[in-house]
Amino acid sequence: MLASIPHMETLRSLPRNPDVVARHPSAEDLDAAQQLISSAQAGREHPQDRHYTDNGSRKSEAGAPHSHHEGEYPIVQTSETPMNGHHVEKTSPKSQKDTSFLGHSCSNCGTKSTPLWRRSPTGAMICNACGLYLKARNVARPTKRNRTQASPEAYHPQNQSVGSQPDPAVTGSEGCTGSCPGGGNCNGTGGAEGCDGCPAYNNRVYKSTARGNVAAHALNRAGNSDAVPSPEAEAPARNSGQPEGNMLVACQNCGTTVTPLWRRDENGHPICNACGLYYKLHGSYRPTTMKKTIIKRRKRVVPALRENSPTAATHSSHGSSASPEASSPATLAYSHDERHRYYSSEPVDQYHRISPAAQRPFGFAPPPVDFTNFNSGAVTLPHHPPPPRLLEPGHPPLSQFARRSISPSSSGNSKKRTLAEAGANTDTGPVPTTLEAGSNQLPPIVSSANPPPPARLSSISSILNHAHARDESRLDPSLAALGRQQQSQPHHPQSSPLAPTQAASQSLPGVSNMDNHVEDRRAKLQREAEEMREQLRAKERELAELAGQ
């Protein structure tokens, strides 16, 4: 590999364009070459670091030749794995290209590969994991978290510390038979239908099949350096690495191996989620008497599944009441139609004869203009006389728009009226059909025969305009005359359809009435101007008195 470095530098230094003069190697190229050389030297000095994933017997066989043949590392491999040794030597520089400077080792955990080298407050070189741990917790990262550390001296104290713990590891290994009852009561062993995505399912148990072989090899090397282990410890190690893998993770406080989330205490020891939350809230360790064998999970309801179910509006999968969002559009439309029929006081048989296609456009139409205070506070200019067709006294509202124009829902009033009040506003006798069928004019919206509801819909206008002091001088004389005629003439329900038209034609204002209206309007404006002048003089006198003081 060293022989290939000058060749690579020669190829890199060749110019791509023949017109360009050949350049010298830059500082970056020299730095890259120096890193490759240092990585090759580090591989020869520490060959045992590359065989921790192999069997312990292979390591013992290859240990002696490495000390004598230091420069012939690819050749001194045993006959069993010549290709494996060549592969390790070939891929070792590539696996260490993530480091910023090769040849370093973490002063805390001893690792030689990390995505980012950091500096401790004392100036020592530490890896990225130890640096982040130190920055977050202000304490050194525990070395037992480093999984790449494989020396027998490092595994010996771990086995002693784990072995000193009582029965939690045994219960964890015995509980891996898949006896979870499910239904929200979880013991972390799996076996139920919903255990696949359960957070309380111990991830050490869940992923033990992928890590079993590595854990078994590591513990076998630890067993070779110690005295003769007990048969109880050798049998699980030969079968699978699951019990040993589970023994490495247990709560330091209560000893449980089942938790939705593993936490760390202030000393870096693993604790379960319950003990961690208890310590965070109360500031003291959780009593062991509070330990439970079953973790109760919260029942989470998915809204999408509940809406798609056929019985979403009336039933729930967990026995809870249905939410307001689950009501169907048909129910909302039905309630809207019932409210509209309640306000319009239509007969039941007439309401059911109307087709749904005819009802739907009116339900989504914009609200009409409020003509509630038309008769009481309207002031008509002299050059804009009111249209005679819309002021005929004998015509009640003919269509659904007229009923909606005086309803509280269209006028913005949220107070409901009783059926008696609604019936009093719309009880005007039979509706003539000749004008609606043959006329191209709009139906009358408000007339003198259908006054607004007393003391409710015009309450704001009565407060502002002072109904007790109102006189007919503010109204149009033609409107006042029509109102007096309507009050003097009794209403005949059995009159013919042509009778209202004849009465309206006899009571239409003439040219003389318009002249009288202009004169009255001029006199009224003169009186108002005189009153304003008098008020202005009074204000000027007050200002003069204040200035004199």
From Swiss-Prot:
Ranges annotated as biased composition (Pro residues): 383-396
Biased composition (Basic and acidic residues): 43-72, 86-97, 516-535
Induction / repression: Expression is induced in mycelia grown in high iron medium or transferred from low iron medium into high iron medium, and repressed in mycelia grown in low iron medium or transferred from high iron medium into low iron medium.
Observed phenotype of the null mutant: Leads to increased iron uptake. leads to partial derepression of triacetylfusarinine C (TAFC) and fusigen production as well as to cellular accumulation of ferricrocin (FC). Also leads to increased oxidative stress.
Example of a GO MF term: DNA-binding transcription factor activity, RNA polymerase II-specific
Keyword NAD found: no
Biased composition (Polar residues): 498-515
Annotated stretches, region: Disordered: 40-100, 141-174, 223-244, 306-332, 375-459, 482-535
Domain comment, as recorded: The conserved cystein-rich region (CRR) localized between the zinc fingers is also involved in DNA-binding and transcription repressor activity.
Protein's recorded name: GATA-type transcription factor sreA
Organism name: Emericella nidulans (strain FGSC A4 / ATCC 38163 / CBS 112.46 / NRRL 194 / M139) (Aspergillus nidulans)
